[in-house]
Amino acid sequence: MNWEITTFIAYFVILLGVALVFYFNGTNKNSEDFFLGGRSMGPWVTALSAQASDMSAWLLMGLPGSILAFGFGQMWIGIGLAIGTAANWILCAKRLRTFSKAANDSITLPQYLTNRFAVDSRALQLVCALIFLFAYTIYVASALVAGTSVFTTLFPDISPKIAMFAFLLIIVAYTFFGGFAAVCWTDFFQGLLMMAALMLVPIVVYFGHSELLDPTALETVYEYTDAATGAVTQCAFGGGIFNASWQDIVSGLGWGLGYFGMPHILVRFMSIEKPSMIKKSSIVAIIWVVISLFSAVMIAYFGRMIMGEELLTHGNQKLVFIAMSRKFFPAGICGLLLAAIIAASISTADSQLLVASSSFTADLYKPFFRKGASEKETLLVGRVLVLVLSLIAFAIANSKGSGAQAIMDMVENAWGAFGSSFGPTILLSLFWKRFNYKGAVAGVVSGFVVDLGWLLTGLTASTGVYEIVPGFIVSFLAAYLVARFTEAPNAEAVAIFEEATKPDAD
């Protein structure tokens, strides 16, 4: 019996079981239950589900692989994400929970941005919903590609299409049946698994196999040739963390700005049972991020000294976690550790799928097509859309055309687009009483345009500065200046602000 595969499969059977429990016990009675868990999530579930949905397989493959190949200068993105995570929990979490409740009990971010200013216009809600629907469908397609890549690496005898379809079925099943609550609970356990897996590998290496650590490997320059292009890449570990260029440092730290506008993370703040629970959630989330990122760095550091030549001469740096797990753990435990990689991929994909579905039903279907739709109908449409978006994402991910490749390339910039478009607007809506609807529209539109323009004109490549940095700055200035020099918000919007910022708001 192959214990690695058996353990791997058993883990996902348990995940599906969780979804079925939520489905058959009648947890999802209405759209707020399905899309926001009835605002009943506890502090631990809120914290770990938010972090698991944030950190995809990049945490276990991309980050350690990059550091393994090029040294500690690659850590700046991780540092930016850690700072951004902490700032998001400290600045936004509690306020967004109270503001979304005060703003007509909003269950999506586009709905919140409209209700927050108490206006009749649905233009901003429409624009935001369309951006969400498009971007998150592509995001899910990207997650399918990433998950399939991991799946076929672990199980090379399985064809990519079968692997992708199996991966899709797992995601769709517990999203469709379980809704937000099931997604949060499964992401909670997956968050624990991801952190445990990341911690266990360097601990076992350091305390059990330190004799294998070869410091000279840090000085050796390895190189590999890309089979497709013939390009030769040299992998020098380089100097310390400050060996990076100023552009890499600014761009890496700029990644942290994305959190303020990332819907599938912000919606976790809206779902917690009580605002007073946010403090505990914040502590848990920040500790999780610091430990997980530090562990990923140590995996790369130890991996370079133990199997740098084996991995880097073949361009397999992203497989360092897999290789270390298989080298130092028995098959049963290894299967669980490898499940953490797939868990990281699906914990991101399921959240994005649910946000896209909720945005369609709450921000497009009900306001524009079926204003009188019942809760039962809305819930059904949401579930159907989970299936539809999944199939579209599957088709995109399976496409071999250049157009599909261009779309997949755009996904890498979606984080910047969300952060630039929505980050400043969300922050100002939570902290500035004078902020108004026109300022919000200006912030969203200008941030998106500058972010996209910076990318399409080649400025990201020529300057080396990540597009979220200028996009966020321009969006913030536009939102502030337009709101400052246009009419003040109406009395209802001011009342919402005052209600949400009361000292006893809970």
PLM segments and residue spans:
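Membrane-embedded helix-loop-helix hairpins and adjacent transmembrane boundary segments
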Residues: 1-506
